[in-house]
Amino acid sequence: MIKRKKIALIGAGSIGGMIAYLVRSRNLGDVVLLDVNGGIAKGKALDIAESSPVAKHNGEILGTNNYADIEGADAIIVTAGISRKPGMSRDDLINTNVHVIKEVAENIAKYAPNAFVVVVTNPLDIMVLAMHKYSHLPSNMVVGMAGVLDAARFSYFIAKELNVSVDSVSSIVLGGHGDFMLPLVKYSSVGGISIADLVKMNLITQDRVNEIIEKTRKGGEEIVNLLKVGSAYYAPAESALLMVDSYLNDRRLMLSCSVYLKGEYGVHDLFVGVPVIIGKNGVEKVIELQLTEEEKNVFNDSVMSIRKLVSNI
């Protein structure tokens, strides 16, 4: 019998609960759904389990508040922490969420030190740095989910603007998960044609592209303001799970993720969003793209915005 993969989800809120359902519905492995509020974790796990006869899910799902239950997990997705409310920035969450991540990291180090860890908690680039600091896991095994989601939003807005299938659009977003993120127009394409060339072909204006870039930067905020309570969870859940899937199944997808840089892009000792290849060894390669001077300036502004917050951890 082939042993199923074990996927632990730390935080049973909207994103954690959605990921638990997606893992089960796609038969990606057994699930441990952990939350400090054990009742929420157990209730959602039971609800998902009871859907299996109808949805034909296989595998086990456990709801718990005991970190010992994550022992031996192959992959862990961390969504624990408070989420944004209308009027809040991602950075407003730092003080509370750093303490949450510290506790999570120490328990991951104790019970699942060989796991591949994806951090979703905001402010993302600071929380993934805290995870690395307090867990002492190798840097190639700790990543943050940012660019996959940001690229998905950018791709969706471009597809809607051009009235094409989202399957035709591919995009790359660099930098921090915030106002200084950098969607790269020349490396983003529709049907293999770069968006920069689409502008030259008069299929979309540069002004409209700039508006879409700004809309992408504000994508999470727009959803927060519409929901009033809580933040986005469908797209973040899909994005985090894609990263875990690439690791567990050695798909070697090139994805934009917040990873620890050791001189790439001129950055040292920070987690910043860049394209990487994720395979069975975690982050297997950082892809260094050629940037224009303007792009370098925006990227460096993004790096500086992250570095200013590092003292908080």
Swiss-Prot record:
Which reactions appear under catalytic activity for this entry? Answer: (S)-malate + NAD(+) = oxaloacetate + NADH + H(+)
So what does this one do? Catalyzes the reversible oxidation of malate to oxaloacetate.
Binding residues annotated for NAD(+), in chain numbering:
11-16, 35, 97, 120-122
Q: Matching CDD domains, A to Z?
A: LDH-like_MDH
Please report the name of this protein according to its UniProt entry.
Malate dehydrogenase
A GO molecular-function annotation? L-lactate dehydrogenase activity
Active site, UniProt feature: 177
NCBIfam families cross-referenced by the UniProt entry: MalateDH_bact, PRK06223.1
